[in-house]
């Protein structure tokens, strides 16, 4: 009872600490035991009231471990000697409780739990768990997997990678029941973090296949593990594993996870995974075609990182936030050229900054190089979402927030150049730049010789640092005042780094129509493009542009006239609608599903046009799907509008029924009652592939319209429409 109250008090304190200001609170207090009688948890025994925790927390960690380890060793000894399945289960539960309580400790939980996890391995407990995972009793396997998931710190992952991957993969092949699947997905989530080689082994041996299979389930905890596992696989697996993930359609299977309307943590983890995949240039286009990437920026813009941080702190498996290695993997997202990656990276680091500031461990952000990347986002970003997140993270870390840089660099006056020099750390050269009256035009055309001779930058390394910053500025700059043919965007479509050459080209009087006539020598001597590979790529693309005048806009795939339009009720049918989208895409159909259900204007026209252009109309009938259509005689409801449009255009309507109860026909508006003449297919979550095969038979040229429920033309297994 005391343990429960104390843990609840910890969570409540964390909530208020992260919700509001913490006056003078740079440290966290670790409470002593309850002043009343009774036995407190092992970390509180013997205390004398609140104690301050230093950032290192060495003394507190050591004291906690000295009290905890004897109890852990006793529990492990009992587990080793347990005879029957019931005794084994009791032993596993006792060890699990000790480890879980350690993870929940504020500020020092990671270090204390690390000590317990190491002790379990050194005492033979990890090897014992791997044996118990092969036990014939299902309950024993479930409990052993649950404990193993909790103790997979770095050294324990090493051990499992050496001797236990086969055991884990055999469990993954079982796929059922969901209680076991949850823990196995959690184990895979941790093992994908071990190394690039381990990721490759897991992917090759079926670990990724198991995670992707579980993405079609509905259990929130399982889906969250799947999203985190896919994110870790993408972050730690390297480009070869990322290619394999895309080949196995991981980007598509992330869609229902990112589209979930019930679990924001799940959506964010899924968005992180797909954003990481999109940073791989080899598979970027395939990831874009999945449709999942389009969900990232709107989701990030709609959420509060402070609330997300509180959710992480309140969950036992994420209460300590990410470790330094995991945080280091997020920094490249900030430096990516993709908006989605920058947004999700800034969001996660902002949330982690809130957690680490509460723990007094903000120094880790300097150690991993995140501070400069966050400052660059603030300085160079024209996107309000990622800029606001980066500013918030910097404030939480106690760092100075730089001023945004004006993008119209060619029009800069001397004062803007001075401000930029100060922000990039070159204040000592402000005077020489001022004396030479360097404005935006001169800055963009500055050569290394001029920098050394006229501006006094003698050190070669310093000049390299300066040109690295100048290249970033050139890439970021807006050239619309001097670039009439939009050469900058065309160069950026070849490679985002090529935008840096825009001003040199337009200053020579070049535009897109003349570029193919230029020689490589002219690009070098007149335009200042010193890298030969870049010159060759630009000239090759310019000559190809003669046959394709707008290469940067490229023709879109057949998404303008989709094969299937999916209509669904947002509050009850989004999960099934997103699953249908993935299944149909994997079978070669192009699918339209509206993401945000915007309320007016051009979006309404686009939505109606999408219904009219689609060959088939799939209607998801989830609980209460038609309730808002009743008495909607003005046809203001979205689902009502979509159904009426599909009926009037003679579309092949395929209703999919999932827990739907039919209303009486007369309560529906007359203009949509004809939908009752179509047979529906009952959705089965357990037999999704079989259900999809039935749906595809309807979509491939076989109309689902059938006014007689028992007609010979009705699909086997289809459910007749309307009440009976």
Curated annotation (Swiss-Prot):
Record annotation: effect of changing residue 601 to P: Loss of NAD(+) hydrolase activity. Abolished ability to promote axonal degeneration following injury
Recorded consequence of changing residue 408 to A: Does not affect phosphorylation level
Effect of residue 190 to A: In WQH to A mutant: Increased NAD(+)-binding to ARM repeats, leading to decreased NAD(+) hydrolase activity
Tissue expr: Predominantly expressed in brain, kidney and liver. Expressed at lower level in placenta.
Known outcome of mutating residue 103 to A: In WQH to A mutant: Increased NAD(+)-binding to ARM repeats, leading to decreased NAD(+) hydrolase activity
Subcellular localization(s) per the UniProt record: Cytoplasm; Cell projection, Axon; Cell projection, Dendrite; Synapse
Impact upon substituting residue 427 to A: Does not affect phosphorylation level
Main location per the UniProt record: cytoplasm
Family from the record: Belongs to the SARM1 family.
Designated name of the protein: NAD(+) hydrolase SARM1
Native organism: Homo sapiens
Gene it is expressed from: SARM1
């Amino acid at each position: 009872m005391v343990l429960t109250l104390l843990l609840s008090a910890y969570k409540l304190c964390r909530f208020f600490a992260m919700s509001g200001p913490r006056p003078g609170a740079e440290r966290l207090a670790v409470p002593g035991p309850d002043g009343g009688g009774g036995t407190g948890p092992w970390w509180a025994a013997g205390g004398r009231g609140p104690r301050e925790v230093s950032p290192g927390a060495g003394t507190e960690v050591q004291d906690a471990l000295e009290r905890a380890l004897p109890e852990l060793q006793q529990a492990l000894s009992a587990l080793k000697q347990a005879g029957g399945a019931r005794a084994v289960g009791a032993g596993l539960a006792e060890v699990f409780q000790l480890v879980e309580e350690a993870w929940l400790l504020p500020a020092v939980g990671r270090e204390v739990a690390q000590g317990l996890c190491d002790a379990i391995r050194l005492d033979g407990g990890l090897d014992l768990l791997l044996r118990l995972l092969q036990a014939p009793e299902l309950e024993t396997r479930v409990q052993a997997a649950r404990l193993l998931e909790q103790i997979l710190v770095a050294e324990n992952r090493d051990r499992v990678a050496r001797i236990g991957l086969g055991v884990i993969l055999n469990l993954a092949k079982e796929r059922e029941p969901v209680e076991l699947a949850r823990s196995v997905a959690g184990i895979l989530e941790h093992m994908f973090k071990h190394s690039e080689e381990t990721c490759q082994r897991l992917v090759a041996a079926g670990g990724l296949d198991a995670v992707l299979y579980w993405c079609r389930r509905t259990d929130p905890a399982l889906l969250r593990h799947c999203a985190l596992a896919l994110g870790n696989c993408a972050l730690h697996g390297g480009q070869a594993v990322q290619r394999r993930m895309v080949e196995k359609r991981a980007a598509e299977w992330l869609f229902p996870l990112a589209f979930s309307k019930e679990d924001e943590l799940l959506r964010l983890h899924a968005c992180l995974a797909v954003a990481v995949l999109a940073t791989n240039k080899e598979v970027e286009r395939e990831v874009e075609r999945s449709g999942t990437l389009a969900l990232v920026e709107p989701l990030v813009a709609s959420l509060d990182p402070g609330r997300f941080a509180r959710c992480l702190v309140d969950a036992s498996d994420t209460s300590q936030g990410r470790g330094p290695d995991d945080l280091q993997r997020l920094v490249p997202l900030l430096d990516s050229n993709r908006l989605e990656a920058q947004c999700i990276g800034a969001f996660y680091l902002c949330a982690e900054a809130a957690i680490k500031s509460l723990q007094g461990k903000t120094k880790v952000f300097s150690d991993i190089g995140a501070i400069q990347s966050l400052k660059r986002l603030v300085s160079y970003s024209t996107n309000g979402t990622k800029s606001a997140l980066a500013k918030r993270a910097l404030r939480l870390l106690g760092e100075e927030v730089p001023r945004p840089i004006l993008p119209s660099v060619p029009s800069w006056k001397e004062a803007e150049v001075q401000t930029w020099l100060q922000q990039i750390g070159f204040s000592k050269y402000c005077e020489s730049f001022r004396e030479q009256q360097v404005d935006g035009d001169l800055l963009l055309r500055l050569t290394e010789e001029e920098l050394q001779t006229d501006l006094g930058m003698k050190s070669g390394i310093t000049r390299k640092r300066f040109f690295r910053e100048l290249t970033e500025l050139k890439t970021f700059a807006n050239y619309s005042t001097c670039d009439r043919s939009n050469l900058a965007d065309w160069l950026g479509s070849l490679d985002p780094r090529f935008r840096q050459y825009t001003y040199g080209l337009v200053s020579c009087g070049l535009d897109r129509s003349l570029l193919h006539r230029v020689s490589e020598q002219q690009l070098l001597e007149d335009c200042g493009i010193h890298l030969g590979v870049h010159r060759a790529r630009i000239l090759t693309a310019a000559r190809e542009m003669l046959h394709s005048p707008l290469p940067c806009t490229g023709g879109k795939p057949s998404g303008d006239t989709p094969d299937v339009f999916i209509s669904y009720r947002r509050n009850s049918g989004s999960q099934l609608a997103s699953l249908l989208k993935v299944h149909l895409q994997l079978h070669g159909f192009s699918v339209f599903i509206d993401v945000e259900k915007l309320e007016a204007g051009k979006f309404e026209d686009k939505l109606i046009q999408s219904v009219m252009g689609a060959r088939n109309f799939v209607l998801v009938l989830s609980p209460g799907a038609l309730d808002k259509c009743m008495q909607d005689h003005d046809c203001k409801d979205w689902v009502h509008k979509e159904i009426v449009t599909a009926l009037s255009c003679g579309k092949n309507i395929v209703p999919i029924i999932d827990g739907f109860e039919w209303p009486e026909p007369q309560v529906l508006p007359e203009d949509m009652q004809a939908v009752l003449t179509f047979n529906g297919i009952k959705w089965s979550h357990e037999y999704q592939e079989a259900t999809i095969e039935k749906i595809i038979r309807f979509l491939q040229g076989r109309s689902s319209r059938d006014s007689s429920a028992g007609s010979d033309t009705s699909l086997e297994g289809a459910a007749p429409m309307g009440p009976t």
